Amino acid sequence: MLDRIASIKKAPDEEYYVPGHRTCAGCGPALTYRLVAKAAGPNTIFIGPTGCMYVANTSYGCGPWRVPWIHAQITNGGAVASGIEAAYKAMIRKKKTDAEFPNIIVMAGDGGAVDIGLQALSAMLYRGHDVLFICYDNESYANTGIQTSPTTPYGANTTFTPPGEVVPEGKKLFPKDNPKVIAHGHPELKYVATASIGWPVDLMNKVRKGLNQEGPAYIHIHAPCPKGWQFPADKTIEMAKLAVQTGMFQLYEYENGEYKLSVKVDKRKPVSEYMKLQKRFAHLKPEHIAKMQAFVDARCAEVGITVPVVASNA
């Protein structure tokens, strides 16, 4: 069992995702990997479907992992993890190894968890494999040129959703809510959570809680992307915090059919305070932002966030 971390000063000193990779400055997914690896510890195997954290971390001489890591296709992270888990259990059962059963963690981007890789993820969860599946969500297919994904927000300017005369808002669709898809579609699943790099202790404790579960668990981690979202690289943590403070991303755990909020928010900032700092939303008109505000209000209400929206200068 992995113990709860009381504070950031009590977090493990050891690093299992170390410098030497080629991620962008201010990369949210890189910080996600660092925190997850720190929480999980040395007895861990990572499965990395194709995505930013595969492309930026696997050039010759640039591998940042101090624990075993295996590449999977973007479609099959859940299947590869299922095979590793089954093989370890078989070897232990047949006394072919005396090694302790490892922490098996899939680290997939939103493409590998919410879109192309959803089928293998769902099958892994349904079969009950003892695996923690984590989505690091940077809200686009970023390593191939910032294409839209199912988690890209409404109104975002991406290479596949450029704003123009016919479609002035850019992306017309609202984002898929994958944590709820997972939670409500897999009734035997014991633990679903969301996390943010803006709250590192909460993130690490959720990783440990997910690993301590018997059977599978799913954690969806919000990981801002300076390049894709078009904000300064030194503002990544500010963006992560604003996403939660505005309700654009909600922090909670889902257990026993109930949502438990992770961060107390007395009032929410309007989504405009978050969106105005990202050039991917620079083309939006007030009516588009109002549409996004209404959508966020509804999503917040679904998990029990009912506090009023109050502007910072109010």
Swiss-Prot record:
Locate the residues binding [4Fe-4S] cluster. C24, C27, C52, C225
Name of protein: Oxalate oxidoreductase subunit beta
Q: Which metal ions or organic cofactors does this protein require, according to UniProt? A: [4Fe-4S] cluster
Free-text comment on the cofactor: Binds 1 [4Fe-4S] cluster per subunit.
What is annotated about its quaternary structure and interactions?
Dimer of heterotrimer of one alpha, one beta and one delta subunit.
List the Pfam families hit by this protein, alphabetically.
TPP_enzyme_C
InterPro entries from the entry? OxalOxred_beta (IPR054952), PorB-like (IPR051479), THDP-binding (IPR029061), TPP_enzyme_TPP-bd (IPR011766)
Q: What does this protein do?
A: Catalyzes the anaerobic oxidation of oxalate using a broad range of electron acceptors, including ferredoxin and the nickel-dependent carbon monoxide dehydrogenase. Does not require coenzyme A as cosubstrate. Enables anaerobic growth on oxalate which is used as energy source by the bacteria.
**Activity response to pH changes:** Optimum pH is 8.7.
Q: Which PANTHER family match?
A: PYRUVATE SYNTHASE SUBUNIT PORB
Write down the Gene3D superfamilies for this protein, in alphabetical order.
Answer: 3.40.50.970
What is catalysed by this protein? oxidized 2[4Fe-4S]-[ferredoxin] + oxalate = reduced 2[4Fe-4S]-[ferredoxin] + 2 CO2
Task: Report the EC code(s) recorded for this entry.
Answer: 1.2.7.10
Q: Which organism is it from?
A: Moorella thermoacetica (strain ATCC 39073 / JCM 9320)
SUPFAM superfamilies membership: Thiamin diphosphate-binding fold (THDP-binding)
List GO molecular-function terms, semicolon-separated: 4 iron, 4 sulfur cluster binding; metal ion binding; oxidoreductase activity, acting on the aldehyde or oxo group of donors, iron-sulfur protein as acceptor; thiamine pyrophosphate binding
Keywords per UniProt? 4Fe-4S, Iron, Iron-sulfur, Metal-binding, Oxidoreductase
The superkingdom listed in its UniProt entry is Bacteria
Q: Which residues form a coiled coil?
A: none
State the Gene Ontology BP annotations: oxalate catabolic process
